[in-house]
């Protein structure tokens, strides 16, 4: 029988192998790496949570501040309502009394015609007086006719109309009635060509400072609910008329400008129509006021995308104006945009030269297009003070060259006069009709009468007829036979001796004319080049 080991006896422990030791080492390394990854992960989560918590705190603080500001604004609006109403009521009373006085004066002066507001105005004071008179009487039609008849006085109107609208009982209603003839729909018919969009824009711009609250400013417009509702209806009517006009692409820029200014003036911008506003602004981006209107209708957040769209459409100059309006000069540097605009203008001019069959007219169009581009870029450089980044000297030199070339082309070419030279014997001049003989070549050569029109046919010519080349590209006079000439030709009339040696022997024959083809061709080329 085998011996049973004594439990109390010490036995020798088995030595671990090298493979087991490597396994344990690998396991420890894996655990360490896993622990490190988990630790980093939880640390990252903690940091993200801290950042989000901080962002939430800032948002809550911002919302609290906005809420507090809104509450204060509402409280201020509520407190100032009575004061604003009192001010407006006092102004309405004053305007009503002034309107009654104006009507009484008009009634008293109607007999002698001294109250004609539509007549000529000599100075700025007279312009303001006439505008105030029309506004006091709420004469919308007279006010409209007065403004539209003075487009040349646009700057004076822009400064005087707000002062005149202040005296109006209901300036907002007066403006809506005044522009109703052409906005939202032109009711004058298709035959009328006058575009009064400029007048609508000026009147709407002039109304804006008049209807702001005298206490809290632009945040509250002093427009009655009925007038504001009418303004909304007008805007909806204009939007519906887009389909009849051929959609946005075919709408005139003055109409677009009037519509957007109408929205801003009466504070009736709709957030759901921002896509429409963007299309309208981009389609009329070359208009000077479009960047400001774009911000006013709520497109400020979309400005970067709109600027990129303008650049992709080749409207770099318009993109520069939009960039400065919203302060994105760092993102869209203006100088590269202006240089790209000039390069595109040159490419467009080159395409005109390649496609045009009339080289002279194409050259004129190319020069005019380049002039317009240079003037626009120079104006932009001056407006935004970019002289250091984009020196304008070379552009000005090129513009001067184009102007000089244009001036030289306008000078008339030196055309030789059709003078009738005297005969060699110092006799009187031939009749004026002699210069209008059929097929006679008109040039600076001495006049040579055709033998078929000679008063006698017996005497031979003093010298043989010149060769055919003397008539250049014209046909030589055909030698009609005397038998086929109608009527009889008698001798030379009294006072008109024989001319240039035809049919009269005693008169010495002049030297035959010498034709210089090179001189004639050069003159003809010069004249043609000038004409085109």
UniProtKB/Swiss-Prot annotation:
UniProt tissue specificity: Expressed in leaves, shoot apex, flowers and during seed development.
One Pfam family named in its UniProt record: Frigida
GO biological process, one term: cell differentiation
Keywords: Developmental protein, Differentiation, Flowering
Source taxon at top rank: Eukaryota
Disordered, as annotated region: 406-432
InterPro entries noted in UniProt: Frigida (IPR012474)
PANTHER family listed in its UniProt record: FRIGIDA-LIKE PROTEIN 3-RELATED, FRIGIDA-LIKE PROTEIN 4A-RELATED
Protein family per UniProt: Belongs to the Frigida family.
Protein name: FRIGIDA-like protein 4a
Organism name: Arabidopsis thaliana
Organism phylogeny: Eukaryota, Viridiplantae, Streptophyta, Embryophyta, Tracheophyta
Designated gene of the protein: FRL4A
